[in-house]
Structures are given as structure tokens and as C-alpha cells.
Amino acid sequence: MRKIKILFLGDSITDAGRDKRNYHNMGNGYPRYASELIAAENQDFDFEFINLGISGNRTSQLFDRLYKDAIELQPDIISILIGINDIWHRHDINNISTTDAQIELNYRSILERIKRETNAKILMLSPYLLDAPDKGNMRSDLSTVIPIVENLAKEYADVYVPLDDIFAEALKVQPEPKFYSGDGVHPNPNGSQFIGEQYAKAIKPLLK
């Protein structure tokens, strides 16, 4: 039976309350739903799922921990969902400002190092934002960051999941954003399951 090690990297959306003492604990977010679906639908493989999302992480912080939390583990597939905190912190009380150029440099550095120091396939998910009363000023920022992520995905990723576009389509059917997220960023169980389903669907070409 072929073994496949899948690593989830990201911020609080990926972390989702996982047990930090056990990186095989998937937490309560999309990694839990994705891993359950992937394992159930691909029983010819022996999967090892690792969740190393850390709440609050920005692109720079993910790069800083990349050796310990990715390179040393030598996974077969690395997925990355990062970037919304770089935008969010432009508007919070701490005023930690990361420019678009810095986000691109940080993200490119992450991807370059993964390519250089592992043989892992890369699955990238775009940052996303659902409508929320206090997040309107973040949408204009995200509209310039998403094309950066898309272009990096074209250059480095084996699979790209345009979550912001996918949520926009889903909201045409279920037009209430709170069905997926109370604050527009952190998914509730419905949102986590939805992302997990998109993830499990997107990863299929990497399991052949």
C-alpha cells in the first residue's frame, strides 16, 4: 500500500483548534473534513495527515518556521492557505502593515524553498473573504492580493483552489454569508466542511 504524507500549512483557518501537542490532530476545521473525505475515497493509500496551521500567522511567520514545520518532515503533498492575516493586520489596532510586494516576496520565498528542498507536490488555496459588516475595507486589499497568489500558483503549484471565487459561486445558491462564516474569515462547521470538500476534490490529480 502506497504511503502518502499530506501536510496542511496555514493560519487559524487551518489551525481550527487543533491539539498543538499532536500534529496528527486535525482540529475542527477544513483539514478534518478534507482528511476524512480523502481517506474514505482513496482506500488504496496509507495516508499520514499533518496539521501545522498556526492561528494568527502571516506569510512572513510561515516562512520563518518552514524548515521545522515542512522541510524536515519531507511530505509528499504540501497545501498552503495563507495571506488573510497580512491584510487583516493592515486594519487592526496593531497596525502591522505588510505591503502587496512583501506578501509576494514572502510567499515566493516559501514556494521556492519548498521546491528547492523537498519533492513535495504543492496545493495552494487562495485567501478569501465573505461579506461581513466590519470587513468591507479588506475587500479592496484582497482584490490585489488574490492575483498575486494566482500568479504564484501558476508558477509553482501543482493544484490551485480559488476559494474566493468558489465561495462567490456558492453564495449565488446560498446567499447568506453567515451560513459559512460568522465574521467573513473564520469558517463555521458549514464553511469548514465546504472548504474540505473543495480540497478533497482538488487533490485527486495528485494521488494518481
Over which residues does each language-model region extend?
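Alpha-helical cap/lid subdomain in secreted, periplasmic
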Residues: Y33-F45, Q61-K208
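Serine-esterase "nucleophile elbow" of acetyl-processing enzymes
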Residues: M1-S55, L66-Q74
